[in-house]
Amino acid sequence: IESLDLCLDFLKNDDIDSLIKISAFHYLFGYIHPFYDGNGRTSRFISSYLIKNELDVLLALKLSYTVKNNINKYYKAFDVCNDRKNKGDITFFVVTFLELLSQSSDDLYTKIADLNDQLNYYNNIINTLVNEKVLNDKQAKCIFILCQNRLFDDTYMNMNTLTELLEKSDTTTRKILKSLESKNLLVKSRNKNQYLYSANLDSLSSQNFTKCFD
């Protein structure tokens, strides 16, 4: 318990860079944790929480994924620093942890940039359909929301959420959804007592899309 208290005091030291503190704390907590579970889940959870507060929640989540995919490198860093011949020097672990964090940041940036490019692609298609009078503004807003949800969350959206985001009545939202469904722009599924909606990205990106409305 005293060692854990010292670790927490270490985190409060403003003279040390925050990311270095988090990296060192991750090792120290895993080393002294009296209920250590053998795979560092607790340490990674705490570190992700600290990174969320210091940087970004998406990066914190991505770090857990990166560690999982580089688990041998992660464990090796522990082994090197745990070796008595290392004489308590945890630099190797701190550097390794920061490398994993940097990799997480790079991967996340690449992923978001790619998704943003895709969103711009579909948004351009939607704007073209508006200009060609295929879609009105309300339909365009609805399908753009569904595109964002499909790309960034990869889930279906219920009508109540759509109604709130569109700032329309239930009746108006139903009409919008029905019109988009008739244009083959929606993918609809049923979950218990409600329908769920997603954008039909294949239909949007089809080269022959506008022919469907001739």
Annotate the PLM regions.
Residues K188-F213:
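Short, cationic-aromatic polyanion-contact patches
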Residues L146-R150:
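Short helix-to-turn junction characteristic of helix-turn-helix DNA-binding domains
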Residues I112-I145:
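Short alpha-helical segments that sit at the start of domains
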Residues F152-L165:
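Short acidic, hydrophobic short linear motifs in intrinsically disordered regions
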Residues E167-S182:
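Short amphipathic alpha-helical interaction segments
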Residues I1-I112:
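Phosphate/pyrophosphate-binding active-site loops
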Residues F97, L162, T173:
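Hydrophobic, well-ordered secondary-structure elements that form the walls
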